[in-house]
């Protein structure tokens, strides 16, 4: 077998009959499989050992040779080669067909490649191939031309003969009629009898005339057909064809079936045809030109690839190796077999029957029928069901053909090549492990023993607990006591990977150091639940074991959970305290008025109380029970840094140093909280709402190394749980308080609602107005009940505490629980004007319960649909962007995009742009940012973090030019500088990072949170699509629902207001032609926008509009934006529109991820005029390739090609990729492979997918060449330092943050002999 690491590209082409015979190890002649008595393969059958190799290692069929020493000998009795049995997986056979057949992919695919090549309509092609019509394959024009006059004379003679015969017959009949009439006259018969005789006579004469005319017409038809006879002409009438052959057989040849197609292809001159088509394209117009373009694609493919089109008609069919279509015996003595064997058997049976019929010299009609059946059976083998009814097996199930084995989720590509099952893995239920450090997980003992079995066995032998591996294995299986000690030793420092399905983004797999735990559940650290989206209601997780040293190093350095605190989508920490931890920290940092031990200033009769000289003294007081942690006190601090303003005031320019004392007015709880933060972090004297905690951790992530952040969040977790248990926050029925004012509030709104009802009954309001009025009334009522609820609840109510701290839930839920549910929607998404007045505490009435179920059920159904849709969106995004990898450090481009940092107000103050987090943050600056005085605030090439952005805003800079992947000029992939900071690490992105996949995951992962519904926006006739459908619409570059026209030019508007439509005319400023937009529906309102005078109002007559401005409400069509404003604008438009959907759901994704996808959508150019290049007009070419080819042509003095940028949807863009392996494994497998084979496509293996498929390391991350062969030679210092890094034990998490390291260990004193 080939080793995958030794080839650089993979080519696919058409196999000719010669190729098939060369691959083959012998011909399969019989349809038999195995002998039912001996269960051994039949000779010459589908499992024959002589063709495919022996079924048992080193053993021939008859048993004459039975040892390795006979390797390579071919047995003279049975003809089987003595070799390994696994050759039955790779040796192929073939079937020699008695008549050629066409390959269904090339005849039946859309468009039909055979039809395009031969210029035949697919309908005609089908008639020829399936023996319904004859086709003329060649005509001897010269001979026909030379002998035409002779033949014409012969024809005239024949016609004359027919006419003479006719005239003679008529003459005779007329005479007979005369005689008969005379006879009747003589007999004196009645006029009636005479008329009868005359009529019958005339009728017979008419028949003679008709018969002769038919004969003449037939001769005329034959002659006309013959004179106009041309190759590729169809003759459906069999009698006509027979006549032609009888008369003029030597002047032409014709046939039916695949043989005729084969002959036509043989006579086909590809070069001449290509030249002729190019000529038509240059000079033709309309349909003719389009047809020629399509045909040229196929013809040029054969011309350039050097493929022979003969490969589309097969003389032999390959038989795949028997191990790939196995036959296994079931317990009942029956056999289960692959469907392919049935399909092959039908081919062989029909083929053998055809051979026999031909040998017997059977009539043509019988032979043709058999040939047609052979063609159909080969079709079924290649692609069952593509034409006609599929061949079915037992129970009417369509058999799986070769094509079916490749396509779809269960096909070869997606099932076995892109997703494989792996060894060294296990799965179990997860439970919470609050005692774990962030980088640890609890692994059940039994599972660990099974996973690490080989390691344990090896170590047992090393330590002399066992004599050999076999006894070590027995020890492990019997779980001897010494096994556990060895297991502890083996798993130390050996990380394992945990994965929770669905893995929506890269944080769905993280590495942890295992800790052995009792029981059978995996313990998971509470802070990584957010990233895994895990909870402990029965979720399961899978464990995988990295084996090699490299894999372990990667797991430890790149995947360890404490190195993955930041979200790759937004660059903000994911490992944050949640739920109980938030409640605990909130409780700890709350200040309660008048709590025990509160500070009181000195008075006449008493000294001041509640002042402490150190946190330790305060803690002692709390332990004695005289001080509450939530009481306000004064305390002298020396180890905690004061807040910035106090520091400036007290310590001046030098700043605070550890040990400097200052007095803080705060609570003991807040001091305890601040002691958890890193040394030197300014004191935070606030109540810790979840948002405040988040901003602190954000800040830590910006300023401190990851390791410090990891330790801090761990400490916060411990404190959070500790204080949550002491806060006594529980929920019971007694805590759900119903506001006493609820009844009177509802009564007054009832009265208002009754008034509206009365007006409706009187006819003062129509149905819609009544509904709107009622909805308004009850919305107000709900809000007021909520307000009353708020006031009624005491501050220490646990339910309110949970909501207020931001731990979970929101006030709406509290209102539903204790106040009233309010209005609910019907299945259409409209409010039902009857409110649910009860709260869940009181219980709903039957009617209320019923109307409430609508919304609840719709929500559940929505969620299910959304998950599937979102998963499919992610799959398409990954596919389109999978080969975007950081390829170089800097592409040196001068281009970039301008991002807004702030908006300047009229009074000169700056308002920070709300979207700065996702636009400017974490980018590389493209030009120096200079303030008004000309000082450089941030230099070009600097990374914009939070401090830099603050500096720019302080200097009054409102917008900067940054580098962006949209303007990156790297050929394949992007450069690190244009991409900027990697969101997940907070540093510049590494070369080799698969930023395309990260982008796809960042956009796809929140997909499940987006809504499914289309919003009905006031006044817009069409529904505005929102949520997931809108994101799909944008990425697929579809024309949006409720499409709004955009201004093609800058100019003044003339608005004409008709009955049902608007008509807008724009008079351009530059005096060019007016642009008219007709038939604009009034249901879609005119757009509101800022005018030149700064006012915001609806578009009206005489307004001035800029190019690209939207004229109506709705969404602009991205293709129009591209046409009117060019690629740069459409990129910005798409990014902005996608962000709007995500922001509406409160999801933060950085622009750069969306930009990566948009860049892939605009990678191609469609050729308008090919100039002197090889490109075909109308074809889609990669921009880089297009520019390179143009440069080459111009250098040689030719005409460059002209093209225009085109926007492709993500599905289309993934199918248009250069890699046929990647495209085939995505969708429409057979179509992609058909095309690739005709074009003799070569896959350069640049992307990730194609390398995964063939089993090479992917060219990203550590698989990239520059990282592959790294030799590590430690320096002396490193050797010394290697032993000073403390292990991940408790002292590492000591309060001094491990800044002190031990001294270097003198290694020379240690003996490195075996442990024994």
From Swiss-Prot:
Keywords in alphabetical order: DNA-directed RNA polymerase, Magnesium, Metal-binding, Nucleotidyltransferase, Transcription, Transferase, Zinc
Protein name, entry field: DNA-directed RNA polymerase subunit beta'
Cofactor binding annotation: Binds 1 Mg(2+) ion per subunit.
Lineage of source species: Bacteria, Bacillati, Actinomycetota, Actinomycetes, Mycobacteriales
GO biological process: DNA-templated transcription
Entry coiled-coil feature ranges: none
Subunit relationships: The RNAP catalytic core consists of 2 alpha, 1 beta, 1 beta' and 1 omega subunit. When a sigma factor is associated with the core the holoenzyme is formed, which can initiate transcription.
Protein's job: DNA-dependent RNA polymerase catalyzes the transcription of DNA into RNA using the four ribonucleoside triphosphates as substrates.
UniProt: Zn(2+) 2 binding residues: 891, 968, 975, 978
Cofactor(s) annotated in UniProt: Mg(2+); Zn(2+)
Reaction(s) catalysed by this chain's protein: RNA(n) + a ribonucleoside 5'-triphosphate = RNA(n+1) + diphosphate
EC number of the protein: 2.7.7.6
UniProt-listed SMART domains: RPOLA_N
Residues binding Mg(2+), per UniProt: 535, 537, 539
Residues that coordinate or bind Zn(2+) 1: 60, 62, 75, 78
Pfam family, one: RNA_pol_Rpb1_3
Record organism: Mycolicibacterium paratuberculosis (strain ATCC BAA-968 / K-10) (Mycobacterium paratuberculosis)
Alphabetized InterPro entries for the sequence: DNA-dir_RpoC_beta_prime (IPR045867), DNA-dir_RpoC_beta_prime_bact (IPR012754), RNA_pol_asu (IPR000722), RNA_pol_N (IPR006592), RNA_pol_Rpb1_1 (IPR007080), RNA_pol_Rpb1_3 (IPR007066), RNA_pol_Rpb1_3_sf (IPR042102), RNA_pol_Rpb1_4 (IPR007083)
Matches recorded under Gene3D superfamilies: 1.10.132.30, 1.10.150.390, 1.10.1790.20, 1.10.40.90, 2.40.40.20, 2.40.50.100, RNA polymerase II, clamp domain (4.10.860.120), RNA polymerase Rpb1, domain 3 (1.10.274.100)
GO molecular function ontology, one term from the record: DNA-directed RNA polymerase activity
Family: Belongs to the RNA polymerase beta' chain family.
């Amino acid at each position: 077998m080939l080793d995958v690491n030794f080839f650089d590209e993979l080519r696919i082409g058409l196999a000719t009959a010669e190729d098939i015979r060369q691959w083959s190890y012998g011909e399969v002649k019989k349809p038999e499989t195995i002998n039912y008595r001996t269960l051994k393969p039949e000779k010459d059958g589908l499992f024959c050992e002589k063709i495919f190799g022996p079924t048992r290692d080193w053993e021939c069929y008859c048993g004459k040779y039975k040892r390795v020493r006979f390797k390579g000998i071919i047995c003279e009795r049975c003809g089987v080669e003595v070799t390994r049995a696994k050759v039955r997986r790779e040796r192929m056979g073939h079937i020699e067909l008695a008549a050629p057949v066409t390959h269904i992919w090339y005849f039946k695919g859309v468009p039909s490649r055979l039809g395009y090549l031969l210029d035949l309509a697919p309908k005609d092609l089908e008639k020829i191939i399936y023996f319904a019509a004859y086709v003329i394959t060649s005509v001897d024009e010269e001979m026909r031309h030379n002998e035409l006059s002779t033949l014409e004379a012969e024809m005239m003679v024949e016609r004359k003969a027919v006419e003479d015969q006719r005239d003679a017959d008529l003459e005779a009949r007329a005479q007979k009629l005369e005689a008969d009439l005379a006879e009747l006259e003589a007999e004196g018969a009645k006029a009636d009898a005479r008329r009868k005789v005359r009529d019958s006579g005339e009728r017979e004469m008419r028949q003679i005339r008709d018969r002769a005319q038919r004969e003449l017409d037939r001769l005329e038809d034959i002659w006309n057909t013959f004179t106009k006879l041309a190759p590729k002409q169809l003759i459906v009438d069999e009698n006509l064809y027979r006549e032609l052959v009888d008369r003029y057989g030597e002047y032409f040849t014709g046939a039916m079936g695949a043989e005729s197609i084969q002959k036509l292809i043989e006579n086909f001159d590809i070069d001449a045809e290509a030249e002729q088509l190019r000529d038509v394209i240059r000079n033709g117009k309309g349909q003719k030109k389009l047809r020629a373009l399509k045909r040229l694609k196929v013809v040029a493919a054969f011309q350039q690839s050097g493929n022979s089109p003969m490969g589309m008609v097969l003389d032999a069919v390959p038989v795949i190796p028997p191990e790939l279509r196995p036959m296994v015996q079931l317990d009942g003595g029956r056999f289960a077999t692959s469907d392919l064997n049935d399909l092959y058997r039908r081919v062989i049976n029909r083929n053998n029957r055809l051979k026999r019929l031909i040998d017997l010299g059977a009539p043509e009609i019988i032979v043709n029928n058999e040939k047609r059946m052979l063609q159909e059976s080969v079709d079924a083998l290649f692609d069952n069901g593509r034409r006609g009814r599929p061949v079915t097996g037992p129970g009417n199930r369509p058999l799986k053909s070769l094509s079916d084995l490749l396509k779809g989720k269960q096909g070869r590509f997606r099932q076995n090549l892109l997703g494989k099952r792996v060894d060294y893995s296990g799965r179990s239920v997860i439970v919470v492990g609050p005692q774990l450090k962030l980088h640890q997980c609890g692994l059940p003992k039994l599972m660990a023993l099974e996973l690490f079995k080989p390691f344990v066995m090896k170590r047992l032998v090393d330590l002399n607990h066992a004599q050999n591996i076999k006894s070590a294995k027995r020890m492990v299986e019997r779980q001897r006591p010494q096994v556990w000690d060895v297991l502890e030793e083996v798993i130390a420092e050996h990380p394992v990977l945990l994965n929770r399905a669905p893995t929506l983004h890269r944080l769905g797999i993280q590495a942890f150091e295992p800790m052995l735990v009792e029981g059978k559940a995996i313990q998971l650290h509470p802070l990584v639940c957010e990233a895994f989206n895990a909870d402990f209601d029965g979720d399961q997780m899978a464990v995988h074991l990295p084996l090699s040293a490299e894999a372990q190093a990667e797991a430890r350095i790149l995947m360890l959970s404490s190195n993955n605190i930041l979200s790759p989508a937004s660059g903000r920490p994911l490992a944050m305290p949640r739920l109980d931890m938030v409640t605990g920290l909130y409780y700890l940092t709350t200040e309660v008025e008048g709590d025990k031990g509160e500070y009181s200033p000195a008075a006449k009769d008493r000294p001041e109380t509640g002042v402490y000289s150190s946190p330790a003294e305060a803690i002692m007081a709390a332990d004695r029970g005289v001080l509450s942690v939530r009481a306000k006190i004064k305390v002298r601090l020396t180890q905690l840094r004061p807040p910035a303003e106090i520091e400036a005031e007290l310590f001046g320019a030098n700043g605070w140093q550890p040990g400097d004392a200052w007095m803080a007015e705060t609570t003991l709880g807040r001091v305890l909280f601040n002691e958890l933060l890193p040394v030197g972090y300014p004191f935070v004297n606030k109540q810790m709402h979840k948002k405040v905690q988040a901003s602190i951790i954000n800040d830590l992530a910006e300023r401190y190394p990851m390791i410090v952040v990891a330790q801090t969040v761990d400490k916060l977790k411990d404190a959070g749980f500790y204080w949550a248990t002491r806060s006594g926050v529980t929920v019971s029925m007694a805590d759900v308080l119903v506001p006493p004012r609820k009844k009177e509030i509802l009564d007054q709104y009832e009265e208002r609602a009754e008034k509206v009802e009365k007006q409706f009954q009187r006819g003062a309001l129509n149905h819609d107005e009544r509904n709107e009025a009622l909805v308004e009334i009850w919305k107000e009522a709900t809000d007021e009940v909520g307000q009353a609820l708020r006031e009624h609840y005491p501050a220490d109510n646990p339910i309110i505490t949970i909501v207020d701290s931001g731990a979970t839930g929101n006030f709406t839920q509290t209102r539903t629980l204790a106040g009233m549910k309010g209005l609910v929607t019907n299945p259409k998404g409209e409010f039902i004007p009857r409110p649910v007045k009860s709260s869940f505490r009181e219980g709903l009435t039957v009617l209320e319960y019923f109307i409430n179920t609508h919304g609840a059920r719709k929500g559940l159904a929505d969620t299910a649909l959304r998950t599937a849709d979102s998963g499919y969106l992610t799959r398409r995004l990954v596919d389109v962007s999978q080969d975007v990898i950081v390829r170089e450090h800097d592409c040196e481009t001068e281009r970039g995009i301008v991002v807004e940092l702030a908006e300047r107000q009229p009074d000169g103050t700056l308002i920070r742009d709300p979207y700065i987090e996702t636009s400017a943050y974490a980018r590389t600056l493209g030009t120096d940012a200079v303030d008004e005085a000309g000082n450089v605030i941030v230099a070009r090439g600097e990374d914009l973090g939070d401090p830099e952005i603050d500096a720019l805003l302080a200097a009054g800079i409102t917008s900067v030019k940054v580098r962006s992947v949209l303007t990156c000029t790297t050929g394949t992939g992007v450069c690190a500088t244009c991409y900027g900071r990697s969101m997940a690490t907070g540093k510049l992105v590494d070369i080799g990072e698969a930023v395309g996949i990260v982008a796809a995951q960042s956009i796809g992962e929140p997909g499940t949170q987006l809504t499914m519904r289309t919003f009905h926006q006031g006044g817009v006739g069409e529904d505005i699509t929102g949520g997931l459908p809108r994101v799909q619409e944008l990425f697929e570059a579809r024309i949006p629902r409720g499409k709004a026209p955009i201004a093609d030019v800058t100019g003044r508007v003339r608005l004409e207001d008709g009955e049902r439509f608007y008509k807008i005319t724009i008079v351009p400023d530059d005096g060019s032609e007016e642009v008219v937009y007709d038939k604009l529906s009034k249901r879609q309102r005119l757009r509101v926008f800022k005018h030149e005078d700064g006012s915001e109002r609806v578009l009206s007559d005489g307004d001035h509009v800029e190019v690209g401005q939207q004229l109506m409400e709705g969404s602009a069509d991205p293709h129009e934006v591209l046409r009117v404003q060019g690629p740069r604008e459409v990129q910005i438009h798409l990014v902005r529109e996608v962000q709007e959907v995500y922001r509406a759901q409160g999801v933060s994704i950085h622009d750069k991820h969306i930009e990566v996808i948009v860049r892939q959508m605009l990678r191609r150019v469609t050729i308008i005029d090919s100039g002197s290049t090889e490109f075909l007009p109308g074809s889609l070419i990669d921009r880089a390739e297009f520019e390179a080819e143009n440069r080459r042509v111009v250098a040689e003095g030719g005409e460059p090609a002209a093209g225009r940028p085109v926007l492709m949807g993500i599905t289309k863009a993934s199918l248009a990729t250069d890699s046929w392996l990647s495209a085939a494994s995505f969708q429409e497998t057979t179509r992609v492979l058909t095309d690739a084979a005709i074009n003799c496509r070569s896959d350069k293996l640049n992307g990730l997918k194609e390398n995964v498929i063939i089993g090479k390391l992917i060219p990203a991350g550590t698989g990239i060449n520059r990282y592959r062969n790294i030799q590590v030679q430690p320096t002396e210092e490193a050797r010394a330092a290697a032993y000073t890094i403390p292990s991940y034990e408790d002292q590492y998490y000591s309060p001094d943050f491990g800044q002190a390291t031990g001294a270097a260990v003198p290694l020379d004193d240690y003996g490195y002999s075996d442990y024994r």
